[in-house]
Every structure is written in C-alpha cells, then in structure tokens.
Amino acid sequence: MLNHECTNNNNNPDPVYLKVAIIEPILLACIDGSSFSEIDRCVQRVIPSSELVQREYIFYLSNSSFISYNGIEKKYFIEPSGLELLEVIYVQAERRIVEYNDLTLKIE
C-alpha cells in the first residue's frame, strides 16, 4: 500500500483507498493533457471501471494535487506530485512485494 500524507478536502475523517491499476492510466493520460473521454479510454484498456468510479478517482487525484483541470482546454493535466507518484508506483511494482492489482494509494 502506498501512503500519501494528504488531507482530503471533503472533511471526511476516513481515509480513501484508490487502486493503483486505475490511478496509473489516469496519470499517464494526463501527461500531455486529456479530456475525460480520453482518460476513460485509457483506463478501460487496462481495467474495466464505470464512469462514476473514474470520476471519483479524478476527484480525489485533483483534490490531492496529483492532477489539475484546465477549464479553457477542458483537459486534465498531471502535476509534479503526480509525476512523483508515478515514480513511487513503478518502484513499488518493481519490488513485487504485493501484486500490482492489489496496490492501493491511501489518501488521508
């Protein structure tokens, strides 16, 4: 499990756990900027998930400053902390302590 010391901004005291298998394609899609539909296609290639789940993940990634939204371009972009998170994901995946599909990110 990846721990991220970030306060989620919805005043919910409970931590949120996000699957890395969904986070990674979202972050990768945002490197060059992507609309929601482009992100959806990238995620669906890796793991089937509903639009609602993807919107929830985007919400938490945005609130935690891993990605940002540009309203003029209507695209999501990765932030420096999102690039750092990708690096952490790859290091954890290389260590193979936990199966990739079981890796989660804890947002507090």
Regions found by a protein language model. Give the residues of each.
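Short acidic, hydrophobic short linear motifs in intrinsically disordered regions
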Residues: 33-44
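Short helix-to-turn junction characteristic of helix-turn-helix DNA-binding domains
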Residues: 26-34
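Short, amphipathic alpha-helical interaction segments positioned at domain boundaries
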Residues: 83-108
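Minor-groove-contacting beta-hairpin "wing" of winged helix-turn-helix DNA-binding domains
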Residues: 74-79
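Short alpha-helical segments that sit at the start of domains
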Residues: 2-27
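A short, conserved structural fragment
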Residues: 62-73
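Short amphipathic alpha-helical interaction segments
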Residues: 48-63
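Extended low-polarity, hydrophobic cluster-rich segments
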Residues: 18, 26-27, 57, 84-91
